[in-house]
Amino acid sequence: VAMLAKDIDIVLLGADRISRSGCVSNKMGSFAAVLCARALAPNAEVVILSESDKIVIDTDLKTHAEEKNDKFEIRRAWGERWERTEKELKLGATQGLVTKNVYFETVEGKHIDRFICETGVLSKEDVKRVSIQRGVKEEEIFGPLKEVS
């Protein structure tokens, strides 16, 4: 990523979730790409291309629990090399390699310049407005159900 980042004009990312504050949850490696671009091509823009329904009412994506995906997905990909590596490093079963299988990471809103969706180009203020509107609508629809439970 770093070798290619110095000559870019734009970093174009998708989004799995967009928070009210403009933070984006996207695939692992997205934040690294943004940081490389900011360091090596400071004039490059970071643009999120996504559907507007990815905008959520949460103000911060950090409130979500850390992913706990199956670590054996990674170990299986390495096959026998995994066991060999553990043996070569002389690690026993109780002190084996720690494996985290994380699919998503957060790119903070301060690193994002604009958002593009089916309704057009959105600023961070536009994202905030959409999120607030969704929160109001959710309360109108589901608020009475909260009182029942």
Explain the meaning of each model-derived region.
Residues V1-S149:
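Conserved phosphate- and dinucleotide-binding cores of soluble alpha/beta proteins
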